[in-house]
Amino acid sequence: MEKFFNIKKSGKIYLQLYSQLKEKIEKEKIKGKLTPVRKFAEELEISPSTVAKAYDELERNGYVTKKEGSGVYVKFQKKKNVYLEDHMESETFRYGYFNPEFNIDFASATPNETVLPMESLKRAINFVLDRDRESAFLYEDPQGYFYLRKTICKKLKKEENIDIEVKNIQIVSGAQQGIDIISEAFLYPNDIVIVEDPTYRGARNSFKKNDCKIMEVSMQKDGFSVRELEKILKRKKIKLFYTMPNFQNPTGISMSFEKKIKLLELAEKYDFYILEDDGLSNLYFDKNKPETLKSLDKNNRVIYIKSYSKIFMPGLRLAYITIPDILLDTILARKFSSDIYHSGLNQRAFQYLLENGDWDIHMEKARNIFKEKQKIMYNSLKKIKDISLKKPKGGLCFWVKLPENVSSKAVYINMLSHGVGILPGVVFSEKKDNYIRISFAQCEEKNIEEGVKLLGCAIEKLK
């Protein structure tokens, strides 16, 4: 079997072997019993412990099963097209989240191109090419460019008072990949994951694909319902609580300081982890940035995902995860088998932007732009009768409650006929058909009032 493997004697050899075995199992090139550890090690001229570690990783991720006294066997692989399933399951795609034909786009929460710092990025890329030349295009460390991870650690210490080592930072291709990797590395079938209701569907789909049991706690004006969470914790053993504590998607709600502390206390008491998804805490409109859960975490209960690309340059797909020591190897293995590593050029350019302050300059500019857009949209929405909404202290969206007899799907269809994109509440919760999410991220300031007027007309017509 050794002729089918290309093992380089550098880097983490067991990860190379794991990745190649995984691929061959998925393509059904390997079936039945795997080659015994010692024999396989001799064939590949590597140590038996390396083969054993690769087999352990295959078992951990559900590709093989070990039979006492018999050997290691490939499990039956249920065929599925992940991308197709995502598209079919996600209301996001059904309701045209990525429709390029909207005249006024209130659906997308991605900033439009006028906000993106093109000149800063061009300078950074040119600097990196002059400094690193061919090195910028070589294979990168699967865990991420070392100096980017080092710069992230420095910023976490300076801005959040978080002490973390470089080895505990994993660079990923966007927050969604981070969620997927954590799901695959940390969660087993039938593990219980708690999510807020409503919440980001991409996270729900990720947990669902890993056959987890999903339970919900409702959102209140200051974050999740403590009473509902404690009720679950007293009767169930949960593995993970997924949350966006600052400017939550879709509600825009920020968890109160008291609830952040309470959640951390409950995680310690009931022995579960918190997955904090932070894409927007830098987009605050008050004087002070809200605290992250990770900055308050004294017992290493928070796995923190920070997305940079969301409000900087969406196409970069750049985020990082802070990883507890216990998960280091499994998360690195999942990243390696997913796409091996993130673009070295992108990582080096972004490290330069972080180091020289361009990121901070961009964020200050973005806060000013979006604060003004939020103000215009809020003042326009207040003119619509029989809806209710709160004004978030940051972020990119409003969560609007419709009149009781008006369906968000009907509003969506009506608005679509006028070339205006919104997202119906069912994208985020099956229970929220009388809510819509509208975002001011993508639309031009001059179009906000017109789009909101059309929304008001649609609601009035459907009442």
Model regions and ranges:
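N-terminal basic, amphipathic alpha-helical segments
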Residues: 1-126, 336-342, 403, 409-417, ...
